[in-house]
Amino acid sequence: MARVTQYQSNFTVGEIDPLLLGRIDIQQYASALEKAQNVVVLPQGGFERRPGLRFMLDISSHLGGSFTTLDGIRLIPFEFSTTQSYMLVFVKNTTSNTRMFVFANGQQITNINGSGNDYLVCALGDIDLDRMYFTQSADTLILVHEDMSPKSIVRGGSNSTWTFSTISLTSPKHAFTLSTSNPSATITPDAVDGTVNITASSSVFTSSHVDQYINVLNGFGRARIVEHTSGTEVKVVTEFPFFEKDVAIASGAWELETGYEDVFSSTRGFPRTCTFHEGRLFFGGSKSLPNSLFGSKIGDFFKFKAHEALDDDALFVTIATDSVNAITAMRSGRDLQIFTTDAEFFVPQADLDPITPSNLVIKNATRRGSKEGIKPVSAEGGTLFIQREGKALREFLFSDVDLNYQANNISLLSSHLLKSPRSMALRVATSTDDGDLLLITNDTDGTMGAFSILRSQNVVAPSEFVTDGKFLDVAVDITDIYVVTERTINSATKRYVEMFDDQRTTDANIQYFSGATSPDQSLPSNTTCSNLSHLEAKTVDVVRDNFVLTDKTVSSGAITIDEAPSSFVEVGLPYTVEVKTLPAEPKLSSGVVVSRKRRILEASPVLDRTQNIAINGFEVPLETLPYTMGSVPTTFTGRKRVAPLLGYSDTAQLTFTQTQPLFATVLGVEYKLSTGQ
């Protein structure tokens, strides 16, 4: 019987796919976990209890009865300035109108536009909000959907002043039903190129011919009609110059091309995606032309109709490949990046030249395809996107070696945490020793995948967030992470807006303290904590003045605690923390121990500011002597020994849990292992 001492110094691989449990040969095994539930893996190596969720708003009554949570709710961040940013919550109320709620600095903005309502009515029409795409420039948010004419939302002079309007676009033209005719007349141009007046020998032109084309068959010349003067005279702009001026082109030697109509219309649909890039507003795809790219005139964001193909003119190009390539997303980065259902593209810019009609080229980079409805996010020079089938998280990153983009699978070790992803958001690192936190909600079971990312140290550490109910949507306002949850409250289905709070340890919680603003409450002067109707009939955790009280059940929107609080009370739903190490596989001279019985004799976790932690069901004593009865929980930093741990097993694993809603951080763990024959 062999005894060895093992030390797991970090957990920076996070929770790995069950399919990898047999891969004791890979380097990542030593830093991985079998389960990481409701914890955040730190880029320094440890893990900590995830933040609690602060209750913000019940939006259940605003969601129209016929709409599902999948198409009727949407979170969109909006950054107005370097000091002012917002979270906008869109809730579909009727087939015509959507209500927009505004949050700033963790508080709801009320009395929008002095209307007495705490929401702005937005006439978005009967669209699926989860397919609505957005971008912004300064004080204006642009919203697009293939079944909705583009909209704008503008913040006015204060937090509560907002304007919703339909954008008036100058649409490009496309021949959806091209037809040609040969009018019985000669035509004579008065110039060779540029803006040209054309005179016909008989009345052949009508006002409907504006934006249609004259094409010379025998010779040179192609021009777009821009103005109808009379039946015998039109003004055109040449695409190809005429051979000579003031010389009649014979009847039958030219044709009139018709069938060109607005690309963006109620008949042909509207843009699918949008982004700003190098002074232009780009639309990626439309309902009828899903694989086309449209760029506005520089500095004139809503003008998409080309004129003379000058460098600042509008752009219109179609991705022509051997597959459909409907555009699902775009991002302005090193280049203009274009994500489609079948592949990833970019617009190269040689020598950093700006994009113009004459040099516009779309290059294919990779062929993975991205999932529609999930907007890619920027992270450390790359772009993270969900692959088309929703089974992989990929990083679209330019390689200086290959001089091309790559789409590496960064969820290879943890693809089981992606279960029909619905939304994705990134909270960028907030300090020099912090990492980015990528959050992905799953439709299948309402869980949330959480990926701690620090690419400079090759850290991609996933864990899983679960709550009493489902996570429906997630978005980030600078550092504040908002979610929409679905919970069953008193036998009714509710949808709440909530926000992660590092200082709280329960879900859908409110706190009572001096100076609180709604939905938090002022500190009660007695033992009754009220205004808890959003948790009616639920069993809740209660923390009073850092003491954890016995569980309470909310009745008539209130609970009764043991004594009046002196500083604060937190009341919220409990959530389970569970972290399980992989089976211990020491490297012995006799070989592997996969088939042997094993026992962990003792464990010594390294803790940081921890108030409660248990290992294999044994609560770790954190108090130090002399101990005072009735004192608040100890906040411990250091190493604690837990022994003896009883029982042989086939795996020999450590399971970290918590018995109370308190803070916990584990930096590493040493354990002594005994192996049988």
Model-flagged regions — what are they?
Residues 244-265, 554-592, 657-676:
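Surface-exposed interaction regions enriched in Ser/Thr/Asp/Glu
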Residues 1-112, 152-156, 161-193, 253-331, ...:
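N-terminal beta-propeller domains
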Residues 131-134, 280, 321-541:
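Beta-sheet-dominated scaffold domains
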Residues 123-133, 562, 628-653, 657-661, ...:
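Beta-sandwich interaction modules
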Residues 107-139, 245-261, 312-326, 364-368:
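Aromatic/His-enriched, Gly/Pro-containing loop or helix-boundary segments
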Residues 105-181, 222-223, 440, 447-497, ...:
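Beta-strand-rich solenoidal segments
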Residues 110-111, 155, 162-253, 406-417, ...:
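Autoprocessing Asn-cyclization modules and mimics
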Residues 597-610:
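A short beta-strand element within beta-rich, extracytoplasmic domains
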